[in-house]
């Protein structure tokens, strides 16, 4: 005990020396040297200016904070920051000019084997990949602006790219001009919310084999092919907006081999196809609005046990189309603006069931060039005849309780 007293007094007296240091950097200084000389927990503060840096490797807990967005210029030489550590913070920096290589996925910031790291309030411009994470967990990716200006898909990588990561928060980022805005593969137990993903060349959001994730209040707008969701289970997509994704292969969402998931309270507006589904099962679609799409829903015959309940369908060219006669899904209590039935008992439910698939949509599915006949008298005549004597549309694709008025989702 007596030996401990001097030690305690010494630690108390010299306590200031044990605190994390703040190290101020100016343009022209070697960032790698500063990182190597810093102790775990130190903060590197970047003064305003341009720093010519590439391949800076960080393997200890550090905070890297910029004042007035100092520029990290990678001089087109590969990655700018490489981070393999826990508890690293990168905030308030501007990154430009990474290398352009698919061999090593050149990125502004590349994390691997990291944990409890935060990247927030940064600007990334004209980088190949923006933020790249692999085999990492407990990441916070918040309020970053990630923008590229390539003209061809192979000239650019993904804006925010995660591979084999878990327990992450991706929040309030803006991503544009990349191949995929956000790309997730083998990512689990994560939340992506309030991101604005616009004008990317392929998908606004693209994920595969990424289970148990939630996507909340994001906007995906004018992306080359919309959003692609593949080979995944236990997904929740709620209160997102999928807008203006136009093209021959563009969708609000493409769902391929998805199961046991929820799509609730979303808006699909002005897309070529609002939702395209293939091989997907046990998904609940509730309280969604499908507005002004070419096709609100393309539901392939390989889908089963899906429920569409209490959704609004308005202003779509086609509400639903399919490629087969077998129907293993349920429509219930949806509002259809094309419904022409009546409500004699005034319970706000139509007394006559509604068949959302018309003959013309079946023909267009089989003969795409026939879309040229849209709004012609022949199409109107065909659809009227099919309503009287249905022969080619699926018998079981029917809403037995259509709503008379649209839902007010607020």
Task: List where the protein language model places each region.
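Acidic Gly/Asp/Thr-rich repetitive segments characteristic of extracellular carbohydrate-active
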Residues: 21-50
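Sec-dependent N-terminal signal peptides
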Residues: 4-14
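Solenoid scaffold repeats with emphasis on beta-solenoid/beta-helix
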Residues: 44, 56, 62, 70, ...
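Eukaryotic tandem repeat interaction scaffolds
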Residues: 203-295
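Extracellular beta-strand/beta-solenoid scaffold signature
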Residues: 74-81, 102-111, 126-129, 133, ...
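Extracellular beta-strand-rich solenoid/capping regions of secreted or surface-exposed proteins
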Residues: 32, 40, 51-65, 72-116, ...
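Functionally critical loop-and-helix segments that line ligand-binding/catalytic clefts
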Residues: 248-252, 283-287, 291-410
